[in-house]
Amino acid sequence: MIRVAVIGGSGYTGGELLRLLAMHNKVEVTYITSREYAGKPISIIHPNLRGFYNINFSQFSWDKIGEKAEAVFLALPHKVSVDYVPKLLEMGLQVVDLSADFRLKNPELYKLWYEFDHPYPDLLKKAVYGIPEIHYEELKGAKLIASPGCNSTATILAAAPLVYSNILDNYRLISDVKVGSSEGGAKPSEGSHHPERQNAIRPYEAEGHRHAAEVEQELQYISKKEVKISLVPHAVSTIRGALASVHGWLISDDLNEIEFWKKIIEFYRGRKFVRVIRGNIHPYPDPKYVIGSNFVDIGFAVEKRVGRITMFSAIDNLMKGAAGQAVQAFNVSRGFEEDEGLRIPPLRPA
């Protein structure tokens, strides 16, 4: 059994990690931290986990983390994880970081998108971007996994087979992402508090969302071409779920849709959590049918009149968009079955 710590275990992502790791046959969660709730039972904050954990939240301690863990999941805010990762690695611990602090390879992009000088550019080169569908081989044995968030995951998985297939007139894409209120975290703000989002469809960061940087990085890795993407998220009134609609323009108006569908299947062949959607009853991906699971549903539509193709992906933002994908990448890094702890069908109704 691998002894695992969750640092920042009181938020939605931390709670989802704890839910999944409770069902994982290869790990034992030995240390869970929260500054605000130290000393209190896990079930006080996560009542859904009542009976699954008999340990309390702890204050973070460098001495204790070294004694109690072999691998660490960091569910901390951006610009906070960066101060933990180097020392954890020096101590010989594996790190799965769910913040954005090690996702970008180019340190200059942190100045542009996050307005800070990255203090550990050498570690950026060593971090493996944690989408197993794209970086399966690189994740094997990885010591530092930079796990992406929901907007970037949904966009990348929708666009990846598109940019790979050489069917586009240009590589300037638009991603429209609709995402539920849990993306905003457990601490409500005016923009994320659910009563403020109910009955709303609200775009945000429309002038340029910072996740566009990692999306472009990954799509350029896949296509070997310069890719530019405009990523505009929209806050909607669901609690869970994210739907990405990625628009591109075709090089020709005679695309064989059956052949392209086969190319998508081939691109994701062997990946346990990708489901390619095509049919008459539910022809396009819908987050409603992946809630509670680590699946991503992929589909597409072509409007030949204007030469446009739209790729769709639907995920649960707390699962494939956060905790589920982090556990999946951890599994690959350790040589476990990719779906260990994740063999969960979606909820219905949800």
Swiss-Prot record:
Residues where NADP(+) binds: S10, G11, Y12, T13, N317
Source species, domain of life: Archaea
GO cellular component, one term: cytoplasm
Catalytic activity entry: [amino-group carrier protein]-C-terminal-N-(1-carboxy-5-oxopentan-1-yl)-L-glutamine + phosphate + NADP(+) = [amino-group carrier protein]-C-terminal-N-(1-carboxy-5-phosphooxy-5-oxopentan-1-yl)-L-glutamine + NADPH + H(+); [amino-group carrier protein]-C-terminal-gamma-(L-glutamyl-5-semialdehyde)-L-glutamate + phosphate + NADP(+) = [amino-group carrier protein]-C-terminal-gamma-(5-phospho-L-glutamyl)-L-glutamate + NADPH + H(+)
Active site: C150
Main EC class the enzyme belongs to: oxidoreductase
GO process annotations (BP): arginine biosynthetic process via ornithine; L-arginine biosynthetic process; lysine biosynthetic process via aminoadipic acid
Pfam families per the UniProt record, alphabetical: Semialdhyde_dh, Semialdhyde_dhC_1
Cell compartments where the protein resides: Cytoplasm
Any one GO molecular-function label of the UniProt entry: NADP+ binding
Record Gene3D superfamilies: Dihydrodipicolinate Reductase, domain 2, NAD(P)-binding Rossmann-like Domain
Keyword Cytoplasm: yes
Pathway in which the depicted protein is active: Amino-acid biosynthesis; L-lysine biosynthesis via AAA pathway; L-lysine from L-alpha-aminoadipate (Thermus route): step 3/5; Amino-acid biosynthesis; L-arginine biosynthesis
Enzyme Commission number(s) from the entry: 1.2.1.103, 1.2.1.106
Signal peptide range: none
Keywords for the protein's UniProt record, in alphabetical order: Amino-acid biosynthesis, Arginine biosynthesis, Cytoplasm, Lysine biosynthesis, NADP, Oxidoreductase
Function: Involved in both the arginine and lysine biosynthetic pathways.
Family to which the UniProt record says this protein belongs: Belongs to the NAGSA dehydrogenase family. Type 1 subfamily. LysY sub-subfamily.
Protein name: [LysW]-L-2-aminoadipate/[LysW]-L-glutamate phosphate reductase
Species the sequence originates in: Sulfolobus acidocaldarius (strain ATCC 33909 / DSM 639 / JCM 8929 / NBRC 15157 / NCIMB 11770)
Gene name, Swiss-Prot/TrEMBL: lysY
